[in-house]
Design a protein with these regions (language model features):
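P-loop NTPase switch module centered on the Walker A-proximal segment
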Residues: 1-102, 106, 146, 215-218
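Active-site phosphate-binding and catalytic loops of NTP-dependent enzymes
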Residues: 2-4, 34-61, 84, 150-162, ...
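Conserved Switch II/interswitch segment of TRAFAC-class P-loop GTPases
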Residues: 82-83, 93-113, 125-128, 133-141
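Single conserved hydrophobic/aromatic residue that forms the stacking wall/gate
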Residues: 319-330
């Protein structure tokens, strides 16, 4: 019988370059108490890849987790470019909702649309966070209209069109449910997440099922599979069956040697984890994205989200010259 994990929320963050999603997550980490008051928080904590730090874009998804009151909030950063579509779709498979971060001056930008379209297609709940409202040229009311127009263009359903709006300055450390509210802290955003993002659900008594959505690597333990437990539970030293996503008839019996959950930016070893939790497992040398970790007695794979094929677009034109020239593909 399916039950909800009311103590967990799983969300992804969508934003255009430089609209402030990394600063927003940094501030949530600080104000949730995930980082101690005397602990230094590195700038751009979610930009772990060298190219990401240099360019300010997100290519690989990162996992972090914060605790607000009695609720654990797993936050996953998403790539913003259509070029990394496969990464986007795999990430969204793990969450029940998204936070759309939009600059209060720049408004909706092209990089936002691709990921938002995927989220809407998967019927995920949406919270819109209009960030940088402290900019002198901020125009939040106009940006609200732009966002609603975008939702309509992307065929959002009625519930998605009725999504909550939060107004924030991540840099200054505050969020508001209304533009006239007091500029105090990030609590309005925390409350909005807990109240509007559905809790993950699954059957804790059913056979174990966990879809591997991303792969991490550690030089000491090797490949690490990351995903959400959809049904059942996982334990250290538990024997499970890996079902190959290309051919469900290919199965391999393995043992979970280490099991991790996330706290802040760290992986924390645990002995057991249940439905709705985003976890990492090690000890499986040839685990791959799209594989399903299953119970031995009922190895049923979870359908793998169809990944958009990489695309390359090119515009070619001839320069006006007096004599015809042959255009050759080299």
């Amino acid at each position: 019988m399916k039950t909800k994990r009311e103590d967990i929320r799983n969300i992804a963050i969508i934003a255009h370059v430089d609209h402030g999603k990394t600063t927003l997550v940094d501030e949530l980490l600080k104000q949730s108490g995930t980082f101690r008051a005397n602990q230094e928080v590195a700038e751009r904590v979610m930009d772990s890849n060298d190219i990401e730090r240099e360019r300010g874009i997100t290519i690989l998804s990162k996992n972090t987790a914060i605790t607000y009151k009695d609720t654990k909030i797993n936050i996953i950063d998403t790539p913003g470019h259509a070029d990394f579509g496969g990464e986007v779709e795999r990430v969204l498979k793990m969450v029940n909702g998204v936070i759309l971060v939009v600059d209060a001056f720049e408004g909706v930008m092209p990089q936002t649309k691709f990921v938002l379209q995927k989220a809407l297609d998967m019927n995920l709940s949406v919270i819109v966070c209009i960030n940088k409202i402290d900019r002198p040229e901020a125009r939040p009311e106009e940006v609200i209209d732009e966002i609603l127009e975008l939702f309509i263009d992307l065929d959002a359903n009625e519930d998605q069109l009725d999504c909550p709006f939060i107004f924030a300055s991540a840099k200054s450390g505050y969020a508001m449910a209304d533009l006239n509210d007091e500029k105090k802290d990030m609590q309005p955003l925390f409350d909005c997440i807990v109240n509007n993002i559905p809790a993950p659900e699954g059957d804790p008594d059913a056979d174990t099922q966990m879809l591997i959505s991303t792969i991490d690597y550690n030089e000491f333990v090797g490949r690490i599979g990351v995903g959400k437990i959809d049904n059942g539970s996982l334990k250290v030293n538990q024997e499970v069956m890996i079902v190959n996503h290309h051919d469900p008839s290919v199965k391999k019996r393995v043992r979970i040697t280490k099991l991790y959950t996330f706290n802040g930016l760290n992986k924390v070893e645990v002995n057991e984890a249940g439905i709705g939790e985003i976890v990492a497992v090690s000890g499986i040398a040839d685990i791959h994205i799209g594989d399903t970790i299953c119970s031995l007695n009922n190895p049923v794979a979870i359908p793998f989200q169809k990944i958009s094929e990489p695309t390359l677009s090119m515009d070619l034109s001839l320069i006006h010259i007096s004599e015809p020239t042959r255009l050759q593909l080299i």
